[in-house]
Amino acid sequence: MGKVIYRPKGKAREYSPWACNLYVGCSNDCSYCFNKRGVLGTVMGGPVPKLKSCIKDNFEAYSTFLSEVQRYRDEIVRDGGLLFSFSTDPCLPETVDLTMMCVSTATGMQIPCQILTKCTSWILNDKVTAQALLLSRDLLSVGFTLTGADDLEPGASPNSRRVEAMRFLHDRGFHTFASIEPVITFGDSLRMIRSAEPGCDLFKVGLLSGDRDAYAGYTMPDDLETFVEEVNGFLTKKGKPVYWKRSVSKALGHPVEGACCVGAGYDILNPSKTTRQ
């Protein structure tokens, strides 16, 4: 694989078969961030976003992206698209300009793209950036991580602002999704789903990984089962799809089923062509 475009493995592959990582580090400073863990935590999970060490400046970053996206274009399109990003928030003030340049290039090549972020300033404060993507919206889906736990994400935009930004994009014809991952508390996650639903086209729900005591205050899997039933009931009434990630199925001991449930391959850009579970 290339310096910036690659095929994710493991749990990350549930999000996208291809991803682009231009930066490492993130100023959102989320306490649960996976990138902060392990021997590479000081590099991957640093508090300041920096270009990857193999890239010297933005010019080289874009040139590298252009070369790699041209090389892998047909495979990326065949597999469903390209995600920005697993190693940082792609819409931080330090990262958004290069991200948008690469997204515009990729969608101009008819490559579907996903953006996953906790930032809203590029939409709510600087609407020029969002407006510039209007021509790409048929090939672009924008997702916001919603936990309802602002105290665990001190550098990120408040969850309420993310819901507002999602609605802003949705009202302008953008495809939107909510990443309800990690679930911190079932109550907060259900509240986020209810709040985001009017401006959201797809929900993805996953549990916190790597912390055995994360749900010590709950009776598992019974309380998780109740949460799943509440979410499925609400989204079925609203006609909105939800993808329950493998972490949920594993904790329950069985796959999650329901009229609103979809698989990992659900195509938010072409929902009518996607078979639901």
What residue ranges belong to the model's regions?
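C-terminal accessory extensions appended to soluble enzyme cores
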Residues: 215-277
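Conserved AdoMet/S-adenosylmethionine-binding subsite of the radical SAM
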Residues: 63-234
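N-terminal [4Fe-4S]-dependent radical SAM core
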Residues: 1-81
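Feature targets compositionally biased, intrinsically disordered low-complexity regions
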Residues: 1, 9, 79-80, 142, ...
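Short linear functional motifs in flexible/disordered or boundary regions
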Residues: 38, 42-45, 96, 190, ...
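Short loop/turn segments at secondary-structure transitions that flank enzyme active sites
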Residues: 26, 36-39, 90, 148, ...
